[in-house]
């Protein structure tokens, strides 16, 4: 889906975010005609994992993946140190891991030029950390610094490892809530982070033989949270920025169990490669069945009610984001989604892009969610209706005033009826409360 299988007059087709673009060698990695997020996806080299999985599962490269070495060479030659999207700390974090996995898994990629480039990127990332930002970006930085520093010997590599090890342990205690959810309250980013942590745990164990207790604790909590929010259709709630960009919940849970219970995976590409150190294959049991009629995630601020007749009701009645990090927040306080046998009956719009555009503005607003809306009538016909947003989202990753949650309670009555209640203070300055 990323690198399409046609070579058209020396043009190579990449497709990210439902947007197809034609590239030629040498590639313009920072082409201003592409959106920044599209360029970021190009720089991640996440798309190379599809090639790597094929190579591991079939002991041969696919036709398209023969371009991989050319693309890595092209990146090194045409991305000057510190210039362009390729040297953004987030893109470096993802690319470091992907290149390391390629080199570690495929001897034909093990050459000094690639190793030198990886070390240079690690050192740059160590000097340009996103610790000021926090959230998933900071976790991605730390995970990559840990994996990267483990590949090298020497005083600096050891210093990077020790620093990142301590910081990640500390940061997980901050970012992982008591109920196991990630503080940014996005199911898709939760699953992405969980996959990264599992991969980190496997790599640490492969190289050092150790299994950090704090890492296992975080993985267990996050896995249990993922199981608890799984819907009948196998998907997850769309609250906040939760596009379907991560692996399915069941796949992530099985990956987690393979690490926690030390069993090998079959035909899973790089995931099976990382679990080869274990002596036996494990079960592919569906871990999503142990769900309650009422799932209450008070720290995350979500409740899910599951009825015997196939209905599922999702209710968001808690804070939408950390105060300092509204990048993935939506104005969806007290939002309700309803499913019947896995099919949406009442559903929010979701997230289609991260661009600075009217679609992004709409998808973050109350109008794109199933919530009560309050507006002030315009003074004249020329003025627009002034909708009051509980979360005043703006730009593509910003938010101003944020309503405070006043009440969030729920329960089950003796007759089995489930009740949910929540309120916020967004309208109190107008003499109203919802």
Regions found by a protein language model. Name each.
Residues 1-28:
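Extreme N-terminal leader/anchor segments
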Residues 7-8, 63-64, 386-387, 418:
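A short coil-to-beta-strand element that immediately follows conserved catalytic motifs
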Residues 9-11, 26, 37, 44, ...:
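A common structural microfeature
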Residues 22-36, 82:
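Short, charged low-complexity linear motifs
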Residues 25-30, 93-102, 140-148, 182-196, ...:
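Carbohydrate-binding/catalytic loop surfaces
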Residues 35-220:
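Aromatic-lined, polymer-binding surfaces characteristic
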Residues 181-346, 409-413:
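Carbohydrate-active enzyme catalytic cores, enriched for enzymes
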Residues 289-434:
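Non-catalytic C-terminal accessory modules of carbohydrate-active enzymes
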């Amino acid at each position: 889906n990323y690198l399409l299988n046609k070579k058209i007059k020396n043009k190579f087709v990449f497709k990210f975010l439902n947007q197809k673009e034609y590239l030629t060698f040498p590639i313009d990695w920072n082409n201003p005609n592409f959106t920044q997020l599209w360029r970021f996806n190009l720089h991640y080299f996440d798309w190379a994992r599809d090639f790597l999985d094929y190579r591991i599962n079939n002991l041969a490269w696919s036709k398209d993946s023969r371009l991989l070495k050319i693309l890595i060479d092209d990146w090194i030659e045409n991305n000057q140190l510190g210039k362009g999207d390729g040297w953004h700390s987030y893109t470096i974090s993802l690319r470091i891991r992907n290149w390391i996995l390629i080199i570690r898994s495929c001897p034909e990629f093990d050459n000094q030029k690639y190793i030198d480039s990886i070390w240079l990127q690690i050192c740059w990332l160590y000097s340009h950390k996103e610790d000021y930002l926090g959230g998933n970006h900071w976790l991605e930085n730390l995970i990559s610094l840990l994996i990267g520093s483990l590949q090298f010997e020497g005083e600096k590599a050891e210093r990077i490892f020790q620093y990142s090890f301590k910081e990640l342990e500390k940061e997980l205690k901050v970012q992982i809530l008591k109920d196991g959810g990630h503080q940014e309250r996005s199911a898709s980013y939760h699953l992405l982070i969980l996959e990264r942590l599992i991969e980190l745990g496997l790599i640490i164990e492969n190289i050092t033989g150790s299994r950090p207790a704090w890492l296992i604790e975080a993985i267990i909590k996050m896995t249990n949270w993922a199981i608890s929010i799984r819907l009948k259709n196998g998907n997850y709630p769309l609250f906040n920025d939760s596009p379907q960009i991560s692996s399915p919940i069941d796949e992530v849970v099985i990956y987690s169990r393979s690490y926690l219970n030390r069993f090998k995976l079959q035909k899973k590409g790089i995931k099976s490669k990382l679990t080869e150190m274990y002596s036996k294959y494990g079960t592919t049991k569906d871990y999503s069945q142990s769900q309650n009629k009422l799932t209450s995630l008070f720290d995350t601020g979500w409740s899910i009610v599951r009825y015997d007749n196939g209905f599922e009701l999702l209710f968001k009645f808690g804070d939408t984001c950390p105060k300092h990090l509204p990048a993935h927040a939506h104005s969806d306080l007290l939002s309700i989604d309803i499913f019947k046998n896995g099919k949406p009956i009442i559903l929010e719009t979701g997230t289609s892009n991260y661009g600075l555009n009217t679609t992004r503005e709409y998808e973050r607003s109350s109008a794109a969610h199933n919530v009560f809306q309050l507006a002030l009538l315009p003074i004249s016909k020329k003025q627009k209706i002034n909708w009051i947003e509980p979360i005043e989202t703006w730009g593509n990753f910003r938010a101003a005033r944020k309503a405070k949650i006043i009440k969030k309670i729920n329960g089950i009555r003796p007759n089995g009826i489930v009740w949910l209640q929540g309120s916020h203070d967004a309208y109190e300055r107008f003499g109203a409360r919802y």
